[in-house]
């Protein structure tokens, strides 16, 4: 039986707090993903010759993509620790920890010497800092997602939950604008010599802004209630896998295809356009920028519409579009025409939005309050490994071994079909669950 909330606030005050929460989750995730995307775009454009040069052009690019993917391997560890802390001590403390961790790692990458300066220590240090980024990212999203959704009115969970989601395309837009500006006003030699470091170092400024906003956000109502009832899980991870393993697996599979397709937009398309199609770097960055805007718009729409037609149906529409578009888009990309190249990416984001915007709300509704942070974070982290971790690397290997670009589309379509099946296994009735109170019946009732 659900217990009445002991932390209800007057409507006006709660509205003010909701606005503060939305700003905190949006700004924080935008900064986190700006840091992440700066690395992804650097991996596409400059890290191969600067840190992996002895491996040859193709080998260096593969190593660069591998350095992007390797951080995903520690995401589950970050998710486990963040989930434990978040379920026992609150969502807010995790949001601050992950923000600082990601920012510090990003700034230090901007200070790293290259292979030409310190030899093999350069890629070793790069990978260590990349692991630090991944560890922080493993806990960031779950905290932001839950803070937004657990503060939301029942009929607006999808909309509220879309705010941390649009931090992803917003971070991408910021990173792309930075890279575009540097690429436009610097020669290739200047960019390779020192220009690529600037966006990494700039993250220090963004972290200060994000910390200032997040420190004033109040803890979520349901966690406050659990504290009052002494209902926090003493061992959230054990409780999670004893009774909710199915939900964790479904959460991972639901996210896998969106993450894989998203990382093509984030990183691979820029490299593919410049290295394989001979497009100018500024052209591929323009395409990525416009794609980021499309991703933002359709993600917000996906969260909003999921409150009207349901989470599951919204996901099904998004993944259906990705399945149908994954192969044909390569015939537009391969024209090397900027307009068609950009159009291919924008159409892909029409599928990415509905399969990403409602994710915060869907995940929160899948898990009971006392293990919600652990379940959401670990499901997300595992989905990142299955989907996005090595998507650019797999895409490059498929291209090198088959010689046809649409083979990458087959890979994405198969993943999207798996995610479509997984989300179809989630009961539509979970959308009726009350996330503002600690519900003991929900705690004992898996999907």
Predicted regions and their residues:
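Extracytoplasmic gate region of multi-pass secondary transporters
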Residues: 40-41, 245-294, 388-391
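Extracellular/periplasmic helix-loop-helix junction of adjacent transmembrane segments
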Residues: 43-77
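Helix-to-loop junctions at the C-terminal end of transmembrane segments
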Residues: 79-91, 299-311
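Cytoplasmic membrane-interface "Motif A"-like loop-to-helix N-cap segments
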Residues: 88-100, 308-319
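C-terminal ends and interior cores of transmembrane alpha-helices
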Residues: 100-118, 320-335
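Glycine-rich segments within core transmembrane alpha-helices of 12-TM secondary carriers
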Residues: 159-183, 379-391
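Multi-pass alpha-helical transporter architecture, strongest
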Residues: 210-217, 413-440
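C-terminal transmembrane helical hairpin of 12-TM major facilitator-type secondary transporters
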Residues: 312-358
């Amino acid at each position: 039986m659900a217990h009445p909330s002991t932390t209800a606030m007057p409507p006006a005050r709660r509205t003010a707090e909701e606005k503060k929460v939305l700003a905190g989750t949006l700004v924080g995730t935008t900064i986190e993903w700006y840091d992440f995307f700066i690395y992804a775009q650097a991996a596409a454009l400059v890290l191969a010759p600067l840190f992996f040069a002895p491996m040859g052009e193709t080998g260096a690019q593969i190593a660069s993509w591998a350095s992007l993917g390797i951080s995903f391997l520690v995401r589950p560890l970050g998710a486990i620790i963040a989930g434990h802390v978040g379920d026992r001590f609150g969502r807010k403390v995790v949001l601050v920890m992950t923000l600082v961790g990601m920012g510090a790692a990003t700034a230090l990458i901007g200070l790293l010497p290259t292979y030409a300066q310190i030899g093999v220590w350069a890629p070793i240090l790069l990978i260590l800092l990349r692991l630090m980024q991944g560890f922080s990212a493993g806990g960031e999203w779950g905290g932001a997602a839950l803070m937004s959704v657990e503060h939301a009115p029942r009929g607006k969970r999808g909309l509220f939950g879309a705010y941390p989601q649009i931090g992803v395309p917003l971070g991408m837009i910021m990173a792309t604008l930075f890279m575009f500006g540097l690429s436009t006003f610097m020669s290739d030699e200047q960019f390779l010599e020192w220009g690529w470091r600037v966006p990494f170092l700039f993250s220090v400024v963004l972290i200060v802004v994000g910390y200032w906003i997040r420190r004033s956000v109040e803890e979520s109502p349901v966690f406050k209630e659990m504290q009052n009832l002494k209902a926090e899980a003493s061992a959230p991870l054990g409780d999670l896998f004893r009774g909710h393993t199915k939900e964790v697996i479904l959460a991972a599979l639901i996210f896998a295809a969106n993450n894989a397709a998203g990382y093509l937009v984030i990183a691979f398309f820029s490299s593919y356009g410049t290295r394989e199609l001979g497009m100018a770097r500024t052209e591929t960055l323009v395409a990525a920028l416009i794609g980021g805007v499309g991703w933002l718009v359709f993600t917000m729409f996906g969260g909003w519409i999921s409150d009207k037609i349901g989470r599951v149906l919204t996901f099904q529409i998004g993944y259906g579009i990705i399945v149908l578009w994954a192969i044909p888009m390569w015939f537009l990309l391969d024209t090397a025409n900027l307009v068609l190249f950009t159009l291919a990416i924008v159409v892909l984001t029409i599928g990415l939005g509905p399969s990403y915007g409602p994710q915060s709300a869907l995940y929160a509704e899948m898990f009971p309050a006392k293990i919600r942070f652990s379940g959401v974070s670990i499901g997300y982290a595992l989905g990142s490994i299955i989907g996005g971790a090595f998507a650019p690397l797999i895409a490059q290997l498929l291209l090198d071994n088959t010689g046809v670009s649409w083979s990458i589309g087959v890979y994405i379509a198969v993943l999207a079909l798996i995610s479509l099946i997984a989300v179809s296994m989630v009961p539509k009735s979970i959308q009726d669950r009350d996330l503002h109170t600690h519900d003991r019946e929900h705690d004992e009732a898996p999907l």
